[in-house]
Regions:
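Helical mechanochemical/support elements of P-loop NTPase systems and associated helical scaffolds
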Residues: 22, 72-76, 122-126, 145, ...
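Conserved inter-motif catalytic segment of the P-loop NTP-binding fold
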Residues: 64-157, 217, 238, 257
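Short, surface-exposed amphipathic charged segments that create phosphate/polyanion-binding patches used
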Residues: 1-10, 127-133, 223-230
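Structured core elements
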Residues: 39-42, 65-68, 114, 145, ...
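The Walker A/P-loop phosphate-binding site
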Residues: 1-87, 206
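Helix C-cap/helix->beta junction micro-motif
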Residues: 60, 137, 175-177
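Phosphate-binding/switch region of NTP-binding enzymes
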Residues: 27-29, 42, 46, 55-56, ...
Length: 257
């Protein structure tokens, strides 16, 4: 249905609304997460994609749906307890198992995040979860995380299609006004310096997303590179990375700039 722009303004705008900024170094470069579109966060296994996304989720504090098909409940619980106590996540794992009431109380400040831990969710299930979120809370999730792309169950013409999944999720983002962050793998054949270039994103799934970030991890440093950014700075080579101090044991990131 077509309508006048004036009507769109009067009825309220959600698509294009930025989510809260978490890091000044990202905001200064125009790296922002907008509702109504998809964001890809790509890297090789062990490049701290999930830790970065988790930090963003925990700090933004907006209505969130998290599809965690690559990390189980106990690992997630351990990391968020570690962030709150600044103690090693392995210690928090044992603490959560021994004292679940204590762990539940510590995590009660995250009740605005809904979780789905299905190891192989279908696109239909993801859409149903998004609709259920809206029915429960009276509004669509401002942020949806799909972690990770390759474990979403989808078939097109008899074969899997990562591009088809992103296309479907991009439409869902536009229809609901959610920002959908999608974690994905990159090709290990593409060198990183230390972050990989845009072409390292597998299966050309980056075509639809307005923001694509690649990640790397070395020692106590986390690297994040904007290799595609419709609304700010980008360098497709991956050379222009932003550095963060990272403590994997407590899942905490700190800006170095």
């Amino acid at each position: 249905v077509s309508f006048k722009l004036a009507r769109a303004v009067r009825r309220g705008l959600t698509n294009g609304e930025p989510l809260p900024d978490v890091f000044r170094s990202l905001k200064d470069r125009g790296i922002r997460f907008y509702r109504g579109g998809t964001v890809l966060v790509g890297g090789v296994p062990g490049s701290m994609k999930t830790m970065f996304i988790g930090h963003m989720v925990d700090t933004m504090k907006v209505p969130t749906l998290y599809i965690s098909n690559d990390t189980n409940e106990l690992d997630i619980i351990s990391r968020y307890l570690a962030r709150r106590t600044k103690q090693d996540s392995n210690i928090m794992r044992m603490k959560a198992l021994k004292d679940p009431e204590w762990a539940a109380e510590k995590l009660s400040d995250m009740d605005w995040v809904r979780w789905n831990f299905n190891a192989s969710p279908s696109l239909e299930e993801i859409e149903e979860e998004m609709m259920a979120f809206e029915e429960l809370w009276g509004e669509h999730a401002h942020l949806v995380v799909v972690d990770i792309l390759m474990k979403v169950d989808y078939y097109e013409d008899g074969g899997g299609s990562l591009e088809g999944i992103v296309r479907y999720l991009d439409k869902l983002a536009r229809d609901t006004g959610s920002c959908i962050i999608i974690a994905c793998h990159t090709s290990e054949n593409e060198d990183g310096h230390p972050t990989q270039p845009l072409k390292a994103i597998l299966n050309k799934v980056s075509k639809l997303s307005t923001l694509v970030l690649t990640t790397a991890y070395d020692g106590n440093t986390f690297y994040l590179a904007p290799v595609k950014n419709r609304n700010g700075f980008a360098d497709s080579t991956g050379y222009s990375s932003i550095q963060f101090l990272v403590d994997p044991s407590t899942a905490i990131l700190e800006e170095l700039e």
